[in-house]
Amino acid sequence: VPASGFFGMR
């Protein structure tokens, strides 16, 4: 999973 998706979900 890309960091963009991870932080976007947070």
Swiss-Prot record:
UniProt function note: Myoactive peptide. Increases the amplitude and frequency of spontaneous contractions and tonus of hindgut muscle.
Annotated tissue distribution: Brain.
Record lineage: Eukaryota, Metazoa, Ecdysozoa, Arthropoda, Hexapoda
Record has Transport as a keyword: no
One of the GO BP terms on file: neuropeptide signaling pathway
Record-given protein name: Tachykinin-related peptide 7
Keyword Aminoacyl-tRNA synthetase among record annotations: no
Protein location: Secreted
Arginine amide PTM positions: 10
UniProt source species: Rhyparobia maderae (Madeira cockroach)
